[in-house]
């Protein structure tokens, strides 16, 4: 039997998603909890791998098991064995052909940036921070250049293992709620560090160092060395994974609720 799970986690206390020799990754915590409940060793496959410090509101995984449990029992049982920073949101039996990674046709990320003179204390590790005032309109204009199909090499980490830097950006926007800014991205897939590198470039535009067309120039150059530094992982959230309705999964997108009454 193959099961799909929706997962939420706080990445601040983990060495990223992917299993590590020190067993301090989110995947390690989840597999340990599932193995205890299933009574056998469980290995999961995820829709995407997040880096150290990156969070998820809607990660999707699948695994195979012969253990018989109700979907509610899987959720409640696994959550009792997980550390505080990881929770299973839902469980669903799926077709044995379903694959959390390869059947995903798009992924969504949000970046929460607090723009104020002093670094936040309560939200440390949960949001990025920038001390200089940022021009929201300039960043909004710049993000329009990201839409569509592009070679995103200028925003690609050196260690990225993706076969191609060409991706399709379906949505890119930024909104402000008081001192908070939310950068919202949806694409067919993302390169390693792509969102953090795009946010880094947008912040440079927002503080007035470059005009909005700088994004178009970076895309044309296809050279990571021409782009501003990678931004902090603290405010980055995996918020959604898109699947065809034929798989019958529950809602797989959960947005940040900043500024919503």
From Swiss-Prot:
Cysteines paired by S-S bonds: none
Pfam families the UniProt entry points to: PseudoU_synth_1
Principal EC category: isomerase
Keyword field contains tRNA processing: yes
Catalytic reaction equation(s): uridine(38/39/40) in tRNA = pseudouridine(38/39/40) in tRNA
Domain of life: Bacteria
One GO process term, biological-process aspect: tRNA pseudouridine synthesis
Keywords: Isomerase, tRNA processing
GO MF term set: RNA binding; tRNA pseudouridine(38-40) synthase activity
InterPro entries in the cross-refs: PsdUridine_synth_cat_dom_sf, PsdUridine_synth_TruA, PsdUridine_synth_TruA_a/b_dom, PsdUridine_synth_TruA_C, TruA/RsuA/RluB/E/F_N
Enzyme Commission code(s) on record: 5.4.99.12
Sites where the protein binds substrate: 109
Active site residues per record: 51 (nucleophile)
Family: Belongs to the tRNA pseudouridine synthase TruA family.
Functional description taken from the UniProt entry: Formation of pseudouridine at positions 38, 39 and 40 in the anticodon stem and loop of transfer RNAs.
Subunit structure of this chain's protein: Homodimer.
UniProt-recorded name of the protein: tRNA pseudouridine synthase A
Highest classification ranks of the organism: Bacteria, Pseudomonadati, Pseudomonadota, Betaproteobacteria, Nitrosomonadales
Gene designation per UniProt: truA
């Amino acid at each position: 039997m193959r099961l799909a799970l929706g997962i939420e986690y706080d990445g601040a206390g983990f060495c990223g998603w992917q299993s590590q020799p020190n067993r301090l990754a989110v995947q390690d915590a989840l597999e340990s909890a599932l193995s205890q409940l299933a009574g056998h060793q469980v290995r999961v496959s995820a829709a995407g791998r997040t880096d150290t410090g990156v969070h998820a509101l809607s990660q999707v995984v699948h695994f195979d098991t012969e253990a018989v449990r109700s979907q509610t029992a899987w959720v409640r049982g696994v959550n009792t064995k997980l550390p505080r920073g990881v929770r299973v949101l839902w469980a669903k039996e799926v077709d044995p052909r379903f694959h959390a990674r390869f059947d995903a046709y798009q992924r969504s990320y949000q970046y929460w940036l607090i723009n104020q003179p002093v670094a936040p204390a309560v939200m440390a590790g949960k949001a990025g921070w920038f001390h200089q005032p940022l021009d929201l309109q300039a960043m909004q204009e710049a993000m329009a250049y990201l839409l569509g199909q592009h070679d995103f090499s200028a925003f690609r980490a050196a260690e990225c293992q993706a076969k191609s830097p060409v991706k399709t950006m379906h949505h890119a926007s930024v909104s402000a709620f008081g001192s908070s800014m939310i950068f919202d991205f949806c694409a067919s897939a993302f390169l390693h560090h792509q969102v953090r590198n795009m946010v880094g470039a947008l912040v440079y535009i927002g503080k007035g160092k470059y005009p909005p067309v700088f994004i178009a120039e970076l895309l044309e150059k296809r050279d990571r060395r021409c782009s501003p530094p990678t931004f902090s992982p603290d405010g980055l959230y995996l918020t959604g994974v898109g699947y065809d309705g034929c798989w019958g999964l529950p809602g797989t997108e959960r947005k940040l609720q900043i500024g919503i009454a």
